């Protein structure tokens, strides 16, 4: 007897692990679906059901044995479920057609049997969004001292010793605002005006016929929105976990039926830290996005039905074919020709020794030159082997967490691309200047964009023949600029690149350094030839500008004079945290414990304090013990490499005294 079918047209907006039914060997996923009809505004709910094999049942971890923590709960179960999810053909079809509207083919019981893409339908489908802001106080029970773990991070130790309190929740929807605080008295909570949590989330029950019986599945539903934005700090402060735990209890604890599972993995569970978002593969069964809310249209934005990337850090997925699948790596055979091109480490940092003079760690070009900067990572992502790798996965991460076969593929394509561009530049009479991981710099004779245009077209053809699509323009994979002087250096322990712009017409051919006349920090005078106080937003940018100035100055120019020009800028920005943040590679000394466990988030940036480098976040007030002297000494060191001069001990003493005086100035509140 034929089973009657139903259909629904629209967009899949999420697939969630609902439950496992051991007695009938069934796993159930919840499918959130948005109908094409804009008048049908609420999320619809359907289900994908699969039968578990004996082997899958034997491998299934017991969730009862998992003890929830601030950072994770039932991680092994999430890893087990992910392997099954990636094998289910209905879910695989939904993932492959995620950018398109689809038609779901279902049984009467809302069980999805097939997913049919509709490529010719492009109806705009705006998504309703809500915003959840979670704050909490994180306190250490024991002060943490000593060196960080082998990973260079402190968050694991902090989470073991900390307490989460004073949780504040604010959830803003189109229908109003829900808010609560963990330390509020019950009377205050009742009297507070605004939405109740039951106005935001409700519980729906679906009776699903499965394996000859009817299962009552409980599902969370948000009538007012499709997507929930959450503030960035919720990734590490523990408040979101507590909110969703309480919400799960509120919705399902007194209802008959099977609720969705409650499991999660937050960045704090990753020993070395991660750039990937938290994973909540089951409850709250709604698309989660982190950061400042923006409007979303399902028909026009790139959409992932689930983002389990954080699991690739853990055994069971790390460096396995499952990790490759999660990343979107498409394995293809690599030709024998590519193997012959494997010469460069991936990625590599190097300076053309033929451009170096006194040291093989620094090259200075003191003649007008065109400079072409090629974004190798962007170009590699146009290659057929790597084009399907998720945009949220950097190639550095791919090299670290993927299979040896995937890593080998990246290395071969990296070498193939480098060989292509370097061979082309040599054949055209150009010189490569430096390679810094995923960026290549080379010098060209063209000084104007019009002169470079024919060369670009020829390079584009060469890349295309090698399997790479060079776009240029606003795509960011290639940038042309023209300079009077250039510097490339690794002498400070990290790569520095600076170039002074060429003079423009009417300037008599003199260099045109990037500086303007501007007011002082109090607005009551002028500092002639001082850098624009609004011109840079980070200390590293000011460092580059100091080098540019040094390249343009006579050899006998005082180093202190060059630094003095940026002191007004430093004073203006002295209490601005984001200005002083730098990578750990630019720091000196052993990192010290941060005040909060946000070093679980990558990439990590640091403030150099008098105790040592400290991982820090731009949104927090500057530490009181910033080591401004370190930043001034690094600026001096950068300038000195451009114009080395002989100085007597008296000059050295004068420089020390002046740097200390500027340090006292910057330390003023």
UniProtKB/Swiss-Prot annotation:
Pfam families: Herpes_heli_pri, Herpes_HEPA. Residues 502-526 are annotated as: Disordered. Component of the helicase/primase complex. Unwinds the DNA at the replication forks and generates single-stranded DNA for both leading and lagging strand synthesis. The primase synthesizes short RNA primers on the lagging strand that the polymerase presumably elongates using dNTPs. The primase-associated factor has no known catalytic activity in the complex and may serve to facilitate the formation of the replisome by directly interacting with the origin-binding protein and the polymerase. Belongs to the herpesviridae HEPA family. This is DNA helicase/primase complex-associated protein. Keywords: DNA replication, Host nucleus. It is found in: Host nucleus. GO terms for cellular component: host cell nucleus. Associates with the primase and the helicase to form the helicase-primase complex. Interacts with the origin-binding protein. Interacts with the polymerase catalytic subunit. InterPro entries: Helicase-primas_cplx_Herpesvir (IPR008650), HSV_HEPA (IPR004996). HAMAP family: HSV_HEPA (MF_04010). One of its GO terms (biological process) is bidirectional double-stranded viral DNA replication.
């Amino acid at each position: 007897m034929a089973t009657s079918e139903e259909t629904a047209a629209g967009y899949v907006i999420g697939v969630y692990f609902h439950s496992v039914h051991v007695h009938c060997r069934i796993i159930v996923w919840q499918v959130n679906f948005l109908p094409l009809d804009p008048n049908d505004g609420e999320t619809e709910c359907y289900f994908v059901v699969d039968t578990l094999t004996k082997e899958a049942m034997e491998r299934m971890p017991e969730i009862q044995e998992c003890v929830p923590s601030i950072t994770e709960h039932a991680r092994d179960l999430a890893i087990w479920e992910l392997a099954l999810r990636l094998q289910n053909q209905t879910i695989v079809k939904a993932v492959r057609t995620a950018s398109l509207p689809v038609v779901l083919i279902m049984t009467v019981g809302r069980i999805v049997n097939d997913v049919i893409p509709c490529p010719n339908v492009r109806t705009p489908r705006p998504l309703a969004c809500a915003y959840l802001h979670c704050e909490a106080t994180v306190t250490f029970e024991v002060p943490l001292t000593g060196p960080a773990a082998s990973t260079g991070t402190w968050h694991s130790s902090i989470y073991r010793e900390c307490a989460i309190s004073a949780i504040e929740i604010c959830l803003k929807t189109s229908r109003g605002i829900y808010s609560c605080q963990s330390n509020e008295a019950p009377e205050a909570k009742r009297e507070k005006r605004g939405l109740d949590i039951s106005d935001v989330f409700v519980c729906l029950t679906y009776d699903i016929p499965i394996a000859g019986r009817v299962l009552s599945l409980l599902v969370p539903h948000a009538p007012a929105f499709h997507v929930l934005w959450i503030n960035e700090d919720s990734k590490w402060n523990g408040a979101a976990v507590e909110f969703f735990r309480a919400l799960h209890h509120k919705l399902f604890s007194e209802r008959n039926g099977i609720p969705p599972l409650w499991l999660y993995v937050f960045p704090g569970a990753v020993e070395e830290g991660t750039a990937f978002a938290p994973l909540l593969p089951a409850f709250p069964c709604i698309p989660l996005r982190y950061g400042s809310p923006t409007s979303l249209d399902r028909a026009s934005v790139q959409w992932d039905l689930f983002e389990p990337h954080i699991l690739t850090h853990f055994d069971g997925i790390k460096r396995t074919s499952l990790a490759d699948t999660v990343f979107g790596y498409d394995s293809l055979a690599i030709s024998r020709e590519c193997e012959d091109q494997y010469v460069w480490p991936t990625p590599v940092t190097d300076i053309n020794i033929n451009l170096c003079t006194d040291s093989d760690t620094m090259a200075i070009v003191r003649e007008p030159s065109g400079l072409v900067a090629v974004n190798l990572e962007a170009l590699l992502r146009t290659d057929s082997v790597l084009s399907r790798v998720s945009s949220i996965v950097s190639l550095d991460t791919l090299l670290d967490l993927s299979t040896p076969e995937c890593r080998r593929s990246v290395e071969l394509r990296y070498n193939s691309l480098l060989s292509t561009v370097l061979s082309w530049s040599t054949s055209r009479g150009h010189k490569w200047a430096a390679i810094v991981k995923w960026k290549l710099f080379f010098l060209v004779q063209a000084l104007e964009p019009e002169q470079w245009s024919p060369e670009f077209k020829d390079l584009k053809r060469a890349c295309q023949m090698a399997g790479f699509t060079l776009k240029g323009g606003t795509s960011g994979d290639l940038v042309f600029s023209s300079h009077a002087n250039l510097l490339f250096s690794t002498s400070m322990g990290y790569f520095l690149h600076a170039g002074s712009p060429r003079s423009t017409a009417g300037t008599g051919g003199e260099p045109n350094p990037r500086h303007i006349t501007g007011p002082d920090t109090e607005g009551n005078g002028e500092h002639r030839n001082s850098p624009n106080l609004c011109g840079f937003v980070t200390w590293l940018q000011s460092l580059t500008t100091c080098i540019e100035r040094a390249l343009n100055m006579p050899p006998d120019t005082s180093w202190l004079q060059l630094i003095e020009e940026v002191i007004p800028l430093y004073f203006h920005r002295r209490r601005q945290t984001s200005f002083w943040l730098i990578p750990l590679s630019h720091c000196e000394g052993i990192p010290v414990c941060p005040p909060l466990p946000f070093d679980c988030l990558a990439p990590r940036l640091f403030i150099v304090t008098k105790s040592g480098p400290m991982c820090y976040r731009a949104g927090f007030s500057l530490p009181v013990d910033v080591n401004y002297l370190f930043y001034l000494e690094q600026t001096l060191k950068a300038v000195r490499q451009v114009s080395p001069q002989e100085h007597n001990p008296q000059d050295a003493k004068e420089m020390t005294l002046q740097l200390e005086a500027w340090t006292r100035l910057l330390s003023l509140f």
